[in-house]
């Protein structure tokens, strides 16, 4: 049997009043990514040919935050219920394709669960994702007759007997385009809310003698939504613990999974150690035996083997060679590239610069738009003065250079191999090979000096 084409509809038009935020609900993040972006990514993983994104509240913000997403933007000007939302996309449905309905505020649904749901869909019928809850309050109840799903009753429309049912609707369903269009046209709003419920499709399918099957989600959290910040925080921690558990099983030593955040992807070698309160963002690659101290933030970095990153260091868009030591309290800004066996110490900031093998920048230093050769020593308080108020300029330092403390290198300037720069020097001209340069004012001694006295 030929596999049907698939398209997805993502409902994302809600305001999210209980978030108390100017952002539309679905733009609030899980692991640093908008909830709806998680759902869009899952729809792509399923192989969806089209993704119809139903939006409404905060439309401009939605389009700004999701500007790069390959979706069909479908505006729902009035929020009149879930069936009304899907109906806005119905003109785009192909009769012979499967349509899966997803929710922008339920970000943890997995590709594997949806594949099972699609596989279970009967010809011309509906496959419905359900879950059993100990406390089903607020959810639509699944009504069965002789084991078959015949209806879904919303909380506000349920009678006392129906309210005791534990099996509930998640809202996720699959049917073909032709059936969706046929049934959506027949949905009414004769209910307590006066809305057009997507759940009414179940009864309509039964009226047409079309089979409705239920597939139960095995993980309740996978189908949980976030309507307020408390629920959002619960989803965040669940997702982070799930990611941490996977990394632990792969051999990464995360000392406290409850205090670890992965907001992107992590590729790792063997015997990696990650202390508490570490945040990984973007795409990060860690070599073998990397140690990351408490409170560090790593974003889009590549770290070589045997590197130690000491506590409270921040690295972004940088590359670090093997056996380097960084921190504590170091900052590598975009474009920083450290070669093997380099040392970058406390309160050092490096931006758009290269540091050669074995060189040390140990404390209280700013290096920007620079090239530092191998086996150099950059003393405390050194500043590369790279900006004249309008343009940036480069500082180039050769190999085996010693730069004394409190030196200012006013770019553009070059320091040749083997040069020595005395402490407190301001360099404004190029320094030759093996030269010693000192620009300090001669030290004066005044005997019997009297300090000024405050006037009474």
Swiss-Prot record:
<feature type="region of interest" description="N-acetyltransferase">
    <location>
        <begin position="251"/>
        <end position="456"/>
    </location>
</feature>
<keyword id="KW-0548">Nucleotidyltransferase</keyword>
<feature type="active site" description="Proton acceptor">
    <location>
        <position position="363"/>
    </location>
</feature>
<comment type="function">
    <text>Catalyzes the last two sequential reactions in the de novo biosynthetic pathway for UDP-N-acetylglucosamine (UDP-GlcNAc). The C-terminal domain catalyzes the transfer of acetyl group from acetyl coenzyme A to glucosamine-1-phosphate (GlcN-1-P) to produce N-acetylglucosamine-1-phosphate (GlcNAc-1-P), which is converted into UDP-GlcNAc by the transfer of uridine 5-monophosphate (from uridine 5-triphosphate), a reaction catalyzed by the N-terminal domain.</text>
</comment>
<dbReference type="InterPro" id="IPR001451">
    <property type="entry name" value="Hexapep"/>
</dbReference>
<dbReference type="GO" id="GO:0009252">
    <property type="term" value="P:peptidoglycan biosynthetic process"/>
</dbReference>
<comment type="similarity">
    <text>In the N-terminal section; belongs to the N-acetylglucosamine-1-phosphate uridyltransferase family.</text>
</comment>
<feature type="binding site">
    <location>
        <position position="380"/>
    </location>
    <ligand>
        <name>acetyl-CoA</name>
    </ligand>
</feature>
<dbReference type="InterPro" id="IPR029044">
    <property type="entry name" value="Nucleotide-diphossugar_trans"/>
</dbReference>
<keyword id="KW-0460">Magnesium</keyword>
<keyword id="KW-0573">Peptidoglycan synthesis</keyword>
<feature type="binding site">
    <location>
        <position position="333"/>
    </location>
    <ligand>
        <name>UDP-N-acetyl-alpha-D-glucosamine</name>
    </ligand>
</feature>
<feature type="binding site">
    <location>
        <begin position="386"/>
        <end position="387"/>
    </location>
    <ligand>
        <name>acetyl-CoA</name>
    </ligand>
</feature>
<comment type="pathway">
    <text>Nucleotide-sugar biosynthesis; UDP-N-acetyl-alpha-D-glucosamine biosynthesis; N-acetyl-alpha-D-glucosamine 1-phosphate from alpha-D-glucosamine 6-phosphate (route II): step 2/2.</text>
</comment>
<feature type="binding site">
    <location>
        <position position="227"/>
    </location>
    <ligand>
        <name>UDP-N-acetyl-alpha-D-glucosamine</name>
    </ligand>
</feature>
<feature type="binding site">
    <location>
        <position position="423"/>
    </location>
    <ligand>
        <name>acetyl-CoA</name>
    </ligand>
</feature>
<dbReference type="GO" id="GO:0009245">
    <property type="term" value="P:lipid A biosynthetic process"/>
</dbReference>
<dbReference type="GO" id="GO:0005737">
    <property type="term" value="C:cytoplasm"/>
</dbReference>
<dbReference type="InterPro" id="IPR038009">
    <property type="entry name" value="GlmU_C_LbH"/>
</dbReference>
<keyword id="KW-0511">Multifunctional enzyme</keyword>
<feature type="binding site">
    <location>
        <position position="169"/>
    </location>
    <ligand>
        <name>UDP-N-acetyl-alpha-D-glucosamine</name>
    </ligand>
</feature>
<dbReference type="Pfam" id="PF12804">
    <property type="entry name" value="NTP_transf_3"/>
</dbReference>
<feature type="binding site">
    <location>
        <position position="377"/>
    </location>
    <ligand>
        <name>UDP-N-acetyl-alpha-D-glucosamine</name>
    </ligand>
</feature>
<dbReference type="InterPro" id="IPR011004">
    <property type="entry name" value="Trimer_LpxA-like_sf"/>
</dbReference>
<feature type="binding site">
    <location>
        <position position="140"/>
    </location>
    <ligand>
        <name>UDP-N-acetyl-alpha-D-glucosamine</name>
    </ligand>
</feature>
<dbReference type="Pfam" id="PF00132">
    <property type="entry name" value="Hexapep"/>
</dbReference>
<keyword id="KW-0012">Acyltransferase</keyword>
<keyword id="KW-0133">Cell shape</keyword>
<keyword id="KW-0808">Transferase</keyword>
<keyword id="KW-0677">Repeat</keyword>
<dbReference type="GO" id="GO:0000287">
    <property type="term" value="F:magnesium ion binding"/>
</dbReference>
<feature type="region of interest" description="Pyrophosphorylase">
    <location>
        <begin position="1"/>
        <end position="229"/>
    </location>
</feature>
<comment type="subunit">
    <text>Homotrimer.</text>
</comment>
<comment type="pathway">
    <text>Nucleotide-sugar biosynthesis; UDP-N-acetyl-alpha-D-glucosamine biosynthesis; UDP-N-acetyl-alpha-D-glucosamine from N-acetyl-alpha-D-glucosamine 1-phosphate: step 1/1.</text>
</comment>
<protein>
    <recommendedName>
        <fullName>Bifunctional protein GlmU</fullName>
        <ecNumber>2.7.7.23</ecNumber>
        <ecNumber>2.3.1.157</ecNumber>
    </recommendedName>
</protein>
<dbReference type="InterPro" id="IPR050065">
    <property type="entry name" value="GlmU-like"/>
</dbReference>
<dbReference type="InterPro" id="IPR018357">
    <property type="entry name" value="Hexapep_transf_CS"/>
</dbReference>
<dbReference type="GO" id="GO:0003977">
    <property type="term" value="F:UDP-N-acetylglucosamine diphosphorylase activity"/>
</dbReference>
<feature type="binding site">
    <location>
        <position position="366"/>
    </location>
    <ligand>
        <name>UDP-N-acetyl-alpha-D-glucosamine</name>
    </ligand>
</feature>
<feature type="binding site">
    <location>
        <position position="76"/>
    </location>
    <ligand>
        <name>UDP-N-acetyl-alpha-D-glucosamine</name>
    </ligand>
</feature>
<feature type="binding site">
    <location>
        <position position="25"/>
    </location>
    <ligand>
        <name>UDP-N-acetyl-alpha-D-glucosamine</name>
    </ligand>
</feature>
<feature type="binding site">
    <location>
        <begin position="81"/>
        <end position="82"/>
    </location>
    <ligand>
        <name>UDP-N-acetyl-alpha-D-glucosamine</name>
    </ligand>
</feature>
